[in-house]
Amino acid sequence: MIIYILGTAVSVLFTKIASAKEINGKKLSKGLLRTFELLAMIPFILIAGTRIDVGTDYAAYEQLYLHPEWFTHFSEGFMLFVRILRSVSLNPRLFFAITSVIIYATFVHTAVEESECAAFSVLFFVISEDFFVSMNIVSQFLAMVFIWRATSELIKGRVMISVALCLMAAAIHPTALCFIVLILLFKIEYSIKRLATVVAVICAAGIGGTKYLIPFIVRYSRYGRYFSTHYAVNKFSVAVPLLLIYVVIFITIVFLVDLKFLEKDSKCRAFTISVLLNIAIMVLSFGLTSNAYRFTYYFGGSIAFYFPSVLNKMQNKKNRYIVEAAVLVLFTVWTTMLIMHHNQNALPYRSFL
């Protein structure tokens, strides 16, 4: 566990410097800022890129790289990526090294570029378990690289670029198409209370309609295996506590942040919509399969990048510090418990270095 703690601490420190722009009143050059940004990426890249048998699906990806002909359920875009890497080397370590560089370099860079407190965003990436999950479902996180950039483009008002990036993500992992929902909701004018009501209605309708939806998924999609194998076991073990945390977060920000910011400020809107979508996904997962909550990862970037924007809109500094501390403690405790109980197979950590 110490390797994760030290790696996170170093990354957060360098991210703080990279986004500070100046130290002791002295403005830092762009070159120096980029250097600190690079240093912030290195701990995650080294930890994940040199790992051996760390991550629940590590062995599966290793076999995929060695024998791609054995695997038929991965998308053509992802398999093309694998074939390109195999043309360079048949050693699966290359796969884990390159995917780690792509995933963590993109996240840190986007955090520095988008977040009002990049250090918080990077820390949140770890304590929300996303870093550990990224060493498991690598193909989905490779798709999320495009989703993170799509989020950035959406905030800048470049909707078509955001949609294009979403489609590129879907070429790697088709489930990435769910991000289109955030794009649509982001462009529609509405009140947060009305959106919350709509989400609640969708959840109720979805739970009632799962008995009709599941047979369709099993018969017509490649995700049917999640309803008839060990994936369908222990449905509520992960989603329930995470659902409660997000519900508390949503209720808290509604009471402590002026609704005009949540409805008009682009970063706050993206955050609020993402939280509501994650609540909806986790509620719907109760009637589907435990792995349905994996859709929430596509909106985790928006939450990590723009949570600081919401916190900064709290006019009462005491409330802001209390909420920030509570969020950090809740997620840290939750993720630590999961990792210590061998969730994501992150422990014991092993590296070839």
Predicted regions located by residue number:
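TM-lumen/periplasm interface segments of multi-pass membrane proteins
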Residues: 18-100, 335-353
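Membrane-interface alpha helices of multi-pass inner-membrane proteins
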Residues: 161-185, 202
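Membrane-interface transmembrane helices that cradle and orient dolichyl/undecaprenyl
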Residues: 147-160
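Alpha-helical transmembrane segments and terminal signal-anchor/GPI-anchor hydrophobic tails
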Residues: 29, 35, 54, 59-63, ...
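Transmembrane-helix signature of polytopic, membrane-embedded enzymes
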Residues: 108-127
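Signature aromatic-anchored transmembrane alpha helix within multi-pass, membrane-resident enzymes
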Residues: 197-201, 315-336
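Transmembrane helix irregularities
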Residues: 50, 170-173, 284
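Short acidic/glycine- and proline-prone juxtamembrane loop motifs at membrane-interface regions
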Residues: 135-140
